[in-house]
């Protein structure tokens, strides 16, 4: 990667450790802030941008409206699924997670609800795989919250924007392609535990839930982790038997 960046005239900043998506992005965002940039774009490495005026349109929209501090485009998968704009996961969907998981499997949708991608508008939340950000807003925040590792970055940022009285904006006439890279996801129990811990943190520090609602969600996530732990142990036993 370092050699490729040198060939393409890009700045490569190595991280000494993997502290998660937000912490990694903050390295680049702080660098951009130090260099005096007004805007920054955070994208996954599996994004493609066939639209030549993509950046110009997004930045132009932010220039016209100073209340917009986060902006996103239409994001489409090779299968034609739209990943923007997004709505928050509701309290009941998070609390009654078995029902929500079943709904997602049947509809093949994510737990965050996708809204109509044909209309440009202010929106509750945007996918973190490709977003434009106003640097001065990030500086006031102290940059991205680094207390989560892999999950809940989008709802945390969306709540911070809402709390600051600013806006997220979805621009429908710009489009990027997300060729999602399928990778080995590792231990499912550890991933579920990480998701539950991230949601508990998000609900405590970056939500409008009261103490009672937070306690209900914490109990629900505790049950979810316990069930996943049992399933993981059963899977390990089954794998050991099959190897004999």
Summary of predicted features, one role per range:
Residues 187-244:
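Non-catalytic, C-terminal membrane-associated alpha-helical segments of glycosyltransferases
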Residues 83, 163, 170, 177-197:
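Nucleotide-sugar-dependent glycosyltransferase catalytic core
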Residues 116-118, 124-175:
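A short, conserved alpha-helix in the catalytic core of glycosyltransferases
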Residues 15-35:
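Glycine-rich, basic loop-to-helix element that forms the pyrophosphate-binding segment
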Residues 37-48:
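Short beta-strand-to-loop acidic/aromatic patch adjacent to the donor-nucleotide binding site
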Residues 48-85:
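Conserved donor NDP-sugar-binding/catalytic core segment of glycosyltransferases
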Residues 91-123:
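Short, flexible, basic/aromatic active-site loop/helix in glycosyltransferases
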Residues 1-17, 27:
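Acidic donor-binding segment of Leloir-type glycosyltransferases
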């Amino acid at each position: 990667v370092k050699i490729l960046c040198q060939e393409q005239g890009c700045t490569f900043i190595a991280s000494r450790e993997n502290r998660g998506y937000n912490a990694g992005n903050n390295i680049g965002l702080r660098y951009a802030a130090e260099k005096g940039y007004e805007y920054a774009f955070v994208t996954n490495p599996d994004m493609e941008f066939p639209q030549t005026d993509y950046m110009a349109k997004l930045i132009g929209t932010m220039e016209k409206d100073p209340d917009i501090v986060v902006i996103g485009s239409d994001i489409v998968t090779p299968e034609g699924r739209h990943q923007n704009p997004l709505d928050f996961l509701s309290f009941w969907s998070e609390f009654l997670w078995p029902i929500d998981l079943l709904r997602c499997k049947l509809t093949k949708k994510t737990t965050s609800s996708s809204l109509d991608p044909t209309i440009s508008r202010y929106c509750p939340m945007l996918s973190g795989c490709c977003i434009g950000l106003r640097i001065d807003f990030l500086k006031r925040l102290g940059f991205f919250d680094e207390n989560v590792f892999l999950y809940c970055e989008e709802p945390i940022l969306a709540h911070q924007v809402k709390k600051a009285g600013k806006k997220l904006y979805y621009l429908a006439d710009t489009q990027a392609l997300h060729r999602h890279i399928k990778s080995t996801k590792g231990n499912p129990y550890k991933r579920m535990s990480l998701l539950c811990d991230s949601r508990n943190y998000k609900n405590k520090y970056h939500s409008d839930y009261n103490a009672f609602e937070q306690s209900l969600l914490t109990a629900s996530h505790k049950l979810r982790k316990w069930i996943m732990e049992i399933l993981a142990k059963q899977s390990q036993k089954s794998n050991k038997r099959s190897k004999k």
